[in-house]
Amino acid sequence: MAAISSPPLTQKALKVASPDTLHLVTDAPLPTLGQDDSVLIRVVCVAINPVDGKSAEMSPTPGATSGTDFAGIVVALHGDAKSRTETADTIKTGDRVMGFVFGNNPHVLGNGAFAEYVTLPRRFLWRVPDHMSLEAAASLPVGVASVGMALHYLRISMSSLLKAVSRSIAAPSASQPHDGAFDSDANVFILVYGGGTSTGAIAIQILKAAGFHPITCCSSESASRAKRLGAVATFDYQSATCGRDIRDYTNDSLTLAIDCLSESASMAICYEAMGSAGGRYVSLDPFPVRGCVRRSIVPDWICSFTQFGQSIPWAPPYNLDERPDDHRLAEEWYHLAQKLLDAELIEAPTLEIRSGGLLHVPEGVAAVKLGQIKRRKLVYHISEEALP
């Protein structure tokens, strides 16, 4: 292992103590660099996601470090990773990076974002572009990874996506329709239910960059931002005719939907909006089986932790076997997403930045769980050392 400085032997970390309870430990060991391309990062900022509170309540692993989204500074590399630092695409010590980690992980108790140090394989990290702050960077990883996984489950080809995104980067002002990145004759509309959520907003931007025509269901308060980010049309989810209006707008041709809320009401609107030919529906959480009211629509749901190539031994329905195809897809997606980030084609959500470090992060986890954080992402400073 090579390092630009000697990390301490112990660190502060938020550990799962019991259901719905996180406890600050001041003498936790640092996570180990256990893989050939693993990287040790000093955490500067973390963002709060619903899964942080949900997993600690639903499937707590006592002693496991909590937290998913982070941004920070690379301080050490595994020896094999160091040998590849001559290539331009390889992360080096001192680089600003962002990523998300499988917190509350029964397989690896000592690695989570809510800590002073975290480790991840190089292939699951993004460099933070020069134009982006670490606070903004911390707000993006779970969302960006989830969108990539959702596109994969919609059967959209990563190679075709890469070609479309490359064209957008080369000619950002040009409006170029998509030309067949999925295995059907469906048109270019894709419905994003929840365009006002962080992940929904990211999905809209990525779909636009890939040449699709994203449409979204969101609140009236979120509609203007969704359009600015690239939605060609917005629909108020509170309207009794929302699903029918989308179906009319798309001329009965909608075949693909991403549901960022994964509730009975959101699923019902997505199903009503889909054209008579059916299609694919992907939710970001387990969907209610009773909502599967049309045989022509193939439903599925994602759990982005499957990208790490491990089983997920949480309580049902999150007890998932290893999914090698998700792991392979994620490596391709991270490469593509870095291009989007570098080209400034993904804008961070509105941020609420709080200080207080790890000691106050549980307050933020509770606030997100209670639904008190609307249309913004909650970010905490963990280390002030690397901030300007």
From Swiss-Prot:
Any coiled-coil regions, as ranges: none
UniProt keyword annotations, A-Z: NADP, Nucleotide-binding, Oxidoreductase
Induction context: Expression is positively regulated by the cluster-specific transcription factor tenR and is induced during cocultures with the natural competitor fungus Metarhizium robertsii.
Enzyme Commission number(s) from the entry: 1.-.-.-
Annotated substrate binding sites: 142-149, 304-308
Residues binding NADP(+), per UniProt: 51-54, 219-222, 237, 284-285, 373-374
Signal sequence, renumbered to the chain: none
Top-rank taxon: Eukaryota
Recorded family membership: Belongs to the zinc-containing alcohol dehydrogenase family.
Function comment: Trans-enoyl reductase; part of the gene cluster that mediates the biosynthesis of tenellin-type 2-pyridones, iron-chelating compounds involved in iron stress tolerance, competition with the natural competitor fungus Metarhizium robertsii and insect hosts infection. TenC collaborates with the hybrid PKS-NRPS synthetase tenS to catalyze the assembly of the polyketide-amino acid backbone, since tenS lacks a designated enoylreductase (ER) domain.
Name by which UniProt lists this protein: Trans-enoyl reductase tenC
Species: Beauveria bassiana
Gene designation: tenC
